[in-house]
């Protein structure tokens, strides 16, 4: 038991459940922010590449 952290109190069953719910909420928020940002960056990069590489017609 020498490696056990004595300063950290043990969590009760209720506290563990609350912590698990909080972590799930944080994960949902991360996905609701990160996924749209990644999609937006991807679309912008694809648009830039398309505009730079499209064939030009001279009239």
UniProtKB/Swiss-Prot annotation:
GO cellular component: membrane
PANTHER family: SINGLE-PASS MEMBRANE AND COILED-COIL DOMAIN-CONTAINING PROTEIN 4
The keyword Membrane is assigned to this record: yes
Residues covered by region (Disordered): 1-20
Basic residues composition-biased segments: 1-11
Alphabetical keyword list: Coiled coil, Membrane, Transmembrane, Transmembrane helix
Protein known as: Single-pass membrane and coiled-coil domain-containing protein 4 homolog
Localization: Membrane
Mode of membrane association: Single-pass membrane protein
Record-annotated membrane-spanning stretches: 30-50
Similarity annotation: Belongs to the SMCO4 family.
Pfam families reported for this sequence: DUF4519
Principal cellular location given in the protein's record: membrane
